[in-house]
């Protein structure tokens, strides 16, 4: 029996071990599967995180792109505002222009009303189209809310947005080009209007000539034909402009069609996104439904299984409990009866107890082994805790068995008297109990499996909950991104609206330009009609041939009008057809959009399976974009390097400018040195006997003013030089900058005609700031610049010829008196400085002859007068003739008291005001031919400048005349004895003045110059001096030929040219009464002193011949 029990226990133990090994094997398989699932889960998590990072980067890039787009939109809006302001300014200017032509517009009001009605119709149609577009946009907005899968399509959207931006930039560039073309066309039209105004002026002149002279009818006809040809050309130009405008409209319509196509593509993409969004939502709902249904199924199945097992287990346990209780009761009765039998079995029980103890120890060892394994399993996974609980249950069961065995031991000790039959029964009962224990173990195992399944279900439930949370988070993110995309979409819609507004503005501008062109056409037609009417009125006196030609011209103009009207109507019809076609195109485009939307919906339903491939492609696109961004960064770096190089080049240019400024400072210092040398030279002249008085007076009157100039801080030489250079750099006109190179005797060749030295510019600028010239305008100062040589000796030897102001026929008598009184002194000083070997006795012997010649000169001498800053005005021939008549009608009145004493103080006050050294010379600036520097250089001998002009005596002999410069002019009064003609420029040494160089001027230091009268024949000006005293001129000529050695070479050729022309006093009167046309043109060329006498219209006017004769006789007697 003991062996059987041992064998049963061993079998049970083997079974338990096999079950444990199976359990461990199953747990290992579960752990391996768990590891595989965890590895897969980690991989999926990594992929998910990577996709999240990529999406974040793409979103950031997209936000940056949107911000850039917004900035560009702001800049575009600002540019549009500026353009609108420009358009408003242009419209204001157009309104001002149209106000001038208000009378002409009354005839075209009906046509304009029709055009406005058409425009209103077109605007109503456009409003209808816009309403339809708004409804379509609303539908699109409703559909756009359902878009999905934007993360996958963001790259495509960005690419398309960049393409749209490029196209917008291209459109802006084209719009700017169109505006430039329109502005150019406007400028052309303005030029055309200017030409029309000039034609009107010409017509007015022609009418006046027709009223005066009927002999010029043929010329008027020719002018009319020319104007007709010009009008034909203008009409052709207008037609060309209309053709170009039509071409531009075609280009704009093609571009609008392209934009519509691109909008359709964008709408198709939006539809596809919306379809994908719908599919995703449906897929999510399906997943949620599946998850819930599967979870519910699993739970229901598990619950049903558990309930069935629980019911069966409870039934079995209840049955066994009842059986066991009955058995125990029977056993207790039987144990009491069989105590005797139990005593016999004590030994056997002791042996069995010993065996059980050994088995218990083995079980303990196995329990320890299992505990170690359970600890390892607990460390690896929490699921092993369930197994430990099972083992603990088994332990509890074993302990309960032990307790039962102890109870049995007690019972056996009490029932030693039990019999062997009872022992057999007990053994049978023990076997039954073993069977129940096995069943209990099986139940425990089943319970553990159920617990494991429950835990697995819980784990799966947790995973599903986590997945649901993740899906919810993804859904939230997706919604956020969708909102961002909605915002972007709204921004794009705003852009499209802005583009439509710009289109409308452009169309409005186009219509306005068309209206303006039509108005201009009507204005030109009406202008032509007016001109034709005026010509008809003027040609009523002509023959029937002129009337026939007028009829022909009227028929031509009427045919042209009809053609213009027909063209205008055709153009209107074309515009209406274009608008109708555009509306049909828009409707067709909407239909196509709807069809494309349906097609793309079907396509996107099929494309859901290929989302993974799209993700991989998008990753590749991201890589390509990153490489592109890196390339762009490299390009930006290269551009920065290029900018740095340009910055270095600019720094080099700045260094060069600094070096130039230093050179200018050095030149300033050189100028100071030269000025000091000049002052030393003037001081050295004081020691001369003959010219000592002149130099002393010069020092007292002029050098003191120079010292005052030096003391002035505001008028320092460097500042004046810098200001002068700034004025030159700021772009003074070429006419004012043109200079004349004076010649110097024996002092080298003069400077080139078109250049100026820095010293010359500075000296001219300094000499302008005299006290008497503060009231002059800056235009006079710039037009009267000095050309001074680099050394003081050259400056002294420079010959300067004054330019008489235009419009002034005579000068004051007081000035002429003082010139006569100082002529002897000038002759003596110049003869001493010229280096001739005449003695003082010869000079005394020739004193009378010098005075006679000075008298002859004084009659015609015109000292230069400062030109006032007046605005020149062009005068017609009638005005000139009327002024000449008034001048001749006025009596010539001379005040003898003013000749003697009265006006001396007035002139001294004015002469004292001229404080600079060369300020006196700038007063009498003249025009000069720069082609004669060598001739003038041969005639300069003394310290001061001298000049020679041809004088013709009554007998026809050629005489040389010498210009003498006084050292100091005595104060005299000032009159404005004005001749209404232009005075010819006086040129030294007999050089002929060039009428084409009317802006070149030189400086005279106030010396007396004989009056010279322009006799313009074939465009050349010959200088003729009217003289009446033959003996005096002969004596002076002999004296001048004996006294001057260096002037013969240059004066002979000039005397030959001047000797051929003899002019009498009557020519002077003729020139005063009627000015030739050439002199009138020369007057209009621009003499700054032409309007000097406008403030002094009340002064007396003298006849030049009469004044010269009386003055000559009186001066001869006084000297």
Swiss-Prot record:
Q: Which domain of life, per UniProt?
A: Eukaryota
**Taking the first listed entry, what is the main subcellular location of this protein, grouped into a coarse class?**
nucleus
GO CC terms on record? nuclear lamina; nuclear matrix
Recorded hits in InterPro entries, A to Z, give: CRWN
BP-aspect Gene Ontology terms: nucleus organization
- Does the entry feature the keyword Coiled coil, yes or no? yes
Coiled-coil annotated residue ranges, if any: 140-226, 328-488
Concerning its family, UniProt says: Belongs to the CRWN family.
This one is known as Nuclear matrix constituent protein 1
- The scientific name of the source species is Daucus carota subsp. sativus
From the UniProt record, report the name of the gene that encodes this protein.
NMCP1
């Amino acid at each position: 029996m003991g062996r059987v029990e041992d064998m049963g226990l061993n079998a049970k133990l083997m079974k338990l071990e096999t079950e444990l090994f199976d359990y461990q094997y199953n747990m290992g398989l579960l752990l391996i599967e768990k590891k595989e699932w965890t590895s897969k889960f980690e991989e999926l998590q990594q992929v998910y995180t990577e996709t999240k990072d990529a999406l974040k980067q793409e979103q950031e890039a997209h936000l940056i792109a949107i911000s850039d787009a917004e900035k560009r939109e702001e800049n575009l809006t600002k540019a549009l505002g500026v353009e609108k302001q420009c358009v408003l300014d242009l419209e204001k200017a157009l309104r001002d222009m149209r106000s001038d032509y208000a009378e002409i517009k009354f005839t075209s009001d009906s046509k304009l009303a029709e055009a406005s009605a058409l425009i209103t119709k077109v605007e109503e149609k456009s409003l209808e189209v816009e309403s339809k577009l708004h409804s379509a946009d609303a539908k699109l907005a409703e559909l756009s809310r359902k878009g999905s899968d934007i993360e996958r399509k963001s790259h495509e959207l960005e690419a398309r947005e960049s393409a749209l931006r490029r196209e917008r930039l291209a459109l802006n560039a084209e719009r700017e080009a169109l505006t430039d073309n329109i502005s150019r066309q406007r400028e052309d039209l303005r030029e055309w209007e200017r030409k029309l105004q000039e034609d009107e002026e010409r017509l007015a002149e022609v009418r006046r000539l027709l009223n005066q002279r009927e002999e010029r009818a043929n010329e008027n006809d020719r002018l009319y034909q020319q104007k007709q040809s010009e009008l034909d050309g203008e009409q052709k130009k207008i037609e060309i402009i209309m053709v170009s405008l039509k071409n531009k409209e075609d280009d704009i319509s093609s571009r609008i069609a392209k934009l519509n196509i691109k909008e359709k593509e964008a709408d198709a993409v939006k539809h596809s996104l919306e379809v994908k969004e719908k599919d995703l939502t449906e897929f999510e709902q399906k997943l949620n439904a599946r998850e819930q249904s599967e979870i519910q199924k699993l739970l229901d199945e598990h619950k049903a299984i558990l309930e069935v097992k629980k019911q069966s287990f409870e039934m079995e346990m209840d049955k066994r409990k009842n059986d066991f209780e009955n058995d125990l009761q029977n056993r207790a009765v039987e144990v009491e009866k069989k105590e005797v039998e139990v005593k016999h079995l004590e030994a056997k029980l002791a042996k069995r107890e010993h065996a059980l103890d050994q088995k218990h120890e083995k079980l303990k060892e196995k329990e320890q082994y299992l505990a170690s394994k359970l600890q390892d399993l607990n460390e690896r996974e929490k699921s092993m805790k369930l197994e430990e609980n099972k083992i603990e249950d088994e332990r509890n069961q074993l302990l309960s068995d032990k307790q039962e065995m102890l109870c049995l031991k007690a019972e056996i000790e009490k029932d030693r008297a039990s019999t062997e039959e009872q022992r057999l029964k007990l053994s049978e009962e023990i076997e039954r109990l073993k069977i129940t224990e096995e069943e209990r173990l099986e139940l425990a195992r089943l319970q553990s499996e159920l617990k494991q399944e429950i835990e697995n279900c819980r784990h799966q439930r947790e995973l599903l909950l986590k997945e649901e949370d993740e899906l919810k988070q993804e859904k939230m993110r997706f919604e956020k991104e969708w909102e961002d995309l909605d915002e972007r979409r709204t921004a794009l819609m705003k852009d499209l609206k802005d583009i439509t507004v710009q289109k409308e503005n452009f169309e409005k501008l186009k219509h306005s330009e068309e209206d303006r062109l039509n108005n201009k056409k009507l204005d030109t037609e009406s202008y032509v009609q007016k001109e034709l009417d005026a010509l008809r009125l003027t040609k009523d006196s002509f023959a029937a041939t002129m009337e026939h030609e007028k009829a022909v011209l009227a028929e031509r103009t009427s045919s042209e009008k009809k053609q213009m009207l027909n063209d205008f109507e055709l153009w209107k019809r074309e515009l209406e057809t274009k608008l109708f076609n555009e509306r049909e195109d828009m409707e067709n485009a909407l239909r196509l959009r709807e069809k494309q939307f349906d097609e793309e919906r079907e396509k996107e339903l099929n494309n859901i399976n290929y989302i993974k491939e799209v993700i991989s492609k998008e990753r590749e696109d991201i890589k390509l974009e990153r490489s592109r961004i890196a390339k762009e960064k490299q390009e930006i770096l290269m551009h920065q390097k290029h900018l740095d190089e340009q910055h270095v080049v600019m720094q080099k240019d700045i260094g060069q400018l600094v070096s130039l400024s230093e050179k200018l400072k050095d030149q300033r210092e050189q100028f100071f040195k030269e000025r000091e040398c000049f002052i030393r030279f003037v001081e050295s002249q004081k020691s001369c006997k003959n010219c000592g008085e002149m130099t002393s007076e010069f020092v007292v009157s002029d050098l003191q003013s120079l010292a005052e100039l030096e003391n002035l801080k505001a008028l320092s030489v460097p500042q004046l030089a810098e200001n002068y250079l700034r004025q030159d750099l700021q772009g003074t006109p070429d006419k004012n900058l043109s200079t004349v190179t004076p010649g110097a005797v024996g002092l080298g060749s003069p400077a080139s005609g078109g250049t100026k030295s820095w010293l010359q510019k500075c000296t001219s600028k300094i000499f302008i700031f005299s006290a008497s010239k503060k009231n002059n305008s800056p235009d006079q100062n710039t037009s009267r610049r000095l050309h001074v040589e680099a050394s003081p000796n050259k400056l002294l030897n420079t010959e300067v010829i004054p330019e008489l102001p235009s419009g002034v026929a005579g000068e004051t008598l007081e000035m002429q008196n003082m010139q006569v009184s100082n002529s002897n002194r000038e002759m003596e000083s110049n003869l001493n400085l010229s280096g001739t070997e005449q003695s003082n006795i010869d000079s005394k012997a020739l004193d009378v002859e010098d005075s006679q010649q000075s008298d002859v000169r004084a009659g015609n001498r015109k000292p230069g007068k400062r030109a006032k800053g007046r605005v020149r005005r062009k005068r017609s021939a009638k005005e000139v003739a009327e002024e000449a008549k008034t001048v001749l009608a006025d009596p010539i009145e001379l005040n003898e008291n003013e000749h003697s004493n009265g006006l001396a103080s007035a002139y001294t006050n004015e002469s004292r005001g001229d404080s600079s050294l060369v300020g006196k010379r700038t007063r009498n600036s003249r025009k000069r031919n720069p082609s004669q520097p060598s001739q003038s250089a041969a005639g300069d001998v003394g310290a001061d400048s001298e000049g020679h002009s041809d004088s013709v005596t009554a007998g026809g002999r050629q005489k040389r005349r010498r210009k003498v410069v006084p050292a100091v002019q005595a104060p005299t009064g000032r009159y404005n004895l004005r001749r209404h003609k232009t005075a010819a420029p006086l040129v030294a040494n007999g050089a002929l003045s060039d009428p084409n160089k009317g802006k070149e001027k030189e400086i005279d230091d106030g010396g007396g110059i004989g009056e010279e009268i322009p006799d313009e024949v074939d465009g050349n000006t010959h200088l003729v001096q009217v003289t009446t005293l033959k003996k005096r001129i002969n004596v002076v000529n002999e004296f001048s030929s004996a006294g001057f050695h260096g002037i013969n070479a240059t004066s002979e050729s000039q005397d030959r040219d001047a000797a051929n022309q003899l002019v009498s006093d009557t020519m002077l009167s003729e020139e005063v009464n009627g000015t030739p046309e050439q002199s009138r043109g020369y007057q209009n060329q621009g003499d700054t002193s032409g309007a000097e006498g406008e403030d002094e219209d009340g002064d007396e006017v003298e006849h030049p011949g009469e004044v010269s004769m009386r003055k000559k006789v009186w001066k001869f007697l006084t000297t």
